[in-house]
């Protein structure tokens, strides 16, 4: 796949941090992308270009870096914004979805009125790794009767199999490693 000059510039800003958060992991640090107004704008513009014709009515940002992309994307699309958070972080009634980690479990929550039946929902996060968190959010969306249009990410770590877990046809990533 040929990458645009804009996405090449974004890729060049992503910093590899070895052995973070633990030994053997190479963390993809997106903070330099966010710090540079040109590359941050390129990212948001690329998301908007992909989703502008899909009649998205709600964008769900996954805690916490997903919020950084979901908010400007929702604004640009004229869609509502809601957030999926860790348990106990949302102030009103919630629904919860548990997902498995390599060692144990975690969960995410949405307000019970965050998405409604018939809404067309896009789930957004910064990085797709194994797909566990995104899958949990997708289940929260569909449990409320909304249509899960797709998942969209800045970065996909293809070697971890997240797109396969979510269904490749439902996954969009601006950059893949």
From Swiss-Prot:
Keywords: Cytoplasm, Glycosyltransferase, Purine salvage, Transferase. Its EC number is 2.4.2.7. The gene is apt. Belongs to the purine/pyrimidine phosphoribosyltransferase family. One of its GO terms (molecular function) is adenine binding. Its main location: cytoplasm. Catalyzes a salvage reaction resulting in the formation of AMP, that is energically less costly than de novo synthesis. GO terms for cellular component: cytoplasm. Homodimer. PANTHER family: ADENINE PHOSPHORIBOSYLTRANSFERASE (PTHR32315:SF3). InterPro entries: Ade_phspho_trans, PRibTrfase_dom, PRTase-like, UPRTase/APRTase. NCBIfam families: apt, PRK02304.1-3, PRK02304.1-5. Pathway: Purine metabolism; AMP biosynthesis via salvage pathway; AMP from adenine: step 1/1. The lineage of its organism: Bacteria, Pseudomonadati, Myxococcota, Myxococcia, Myxococcales. Gene3D superfamilies: 3.40.50.2020. HAMAP family: Aden_phosphoribosyltr. SUPFAM superfamilies: PRTase-like. Signal peptide: none annotated. This is Adenine phosphoribosyltransferase. It catalyses: AMP + diphosphate = 5-phospho-alpha-D-ribose 1-diphosphate + adenine. GO terms for biological process: adenine salvage; AMP salvage; purine ribonucleoside salvage. It is found in: Cytoplasm. Pfam families: Pribosyltran. It comes from the Bacteria.
């Amino acid at each position: 796949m040929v990458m645009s000059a804009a996405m090449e510039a974004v890729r060049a800003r992503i910093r590899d941090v070895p052995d973070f958060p633990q030994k053997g992991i190479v963390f993809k640090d997106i903070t330099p992308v966010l710090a540079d107004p040109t590359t941050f704008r390129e990212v948001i513009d690329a998301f908007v270009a992909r989703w502008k014709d899909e009649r998205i009515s709600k964008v769900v940002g996954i805690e916490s870096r997903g919020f950084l992309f979901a908010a400007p994307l929702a604004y640009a699309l004229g869609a509502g914004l809601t957030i999926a958070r860790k348990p106990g972080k949302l102030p009103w009634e919630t629904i919860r979805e548990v997902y498995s980690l390599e060692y144990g479990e975690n969960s995410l929550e949405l307000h019970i009125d965050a998405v409604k039946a018939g809404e067309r929902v896009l789930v957004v996060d910064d990085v797709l790794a194994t797909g566990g968190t995104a899958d949990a959010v997708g289940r929260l969306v569909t449990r409320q009767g909304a249509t899960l249009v797709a998942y969209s990410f800045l970065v996909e770590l293809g070697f971890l199999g997240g797109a396969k877990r979510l269904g490749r046809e439902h996954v969009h990533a601006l950059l893949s490693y």
